[in-house]
Swiss-Prot record:
One Gene Ontology MF term: DNA binding
Organism: African swine fever virus (isolate Pig/Kenya/KEN-50/1950)
Entry protein name: Structural DNA-binding protein p10
Polar residues bias: start-end ranges: 1-12
Subcellular location as annotated: Virion
Location of region: Disordered: 1-38
Length: 77
């Protein structure tokens, strides 16, 4: 019986590892999603593209965030 309990605990440990892995993978996919779309573009690059396409970088007196610039660049394509 004790051996069975021992194997059970290791099995449980394995299962706890599983979701944590998928969780980190999910977070990772979130990151790769944007970078894959824009090939790891930096904020400077986004600003340059926006300028070349005539997209305003400032809105309501403040600079647009990288994600907002991304959206506008995507729309203008």
């Amino acid at each position: 019986m004790p051996t069975k309990a021992g194997t059970k605990s290791t099995a449980n440990k394995k299962t706890t590892k599983g979701p944590s892995k998928s969780g980190s993978a999910k977070g990772h996919t979130g990151k790769t999603h944007a970078t894959a779309l824009h090939h790891g573009m930096l904020y400077k690059d986004m600003v340059n593209i926006a300028k070349s396409k005539g997209i305003p970088i400032y809105q309501n007196g403040s600079r647009l965030t990288k994600s907002e610039l991304e959206k506008k660049i995507k729309r203008s394509k």
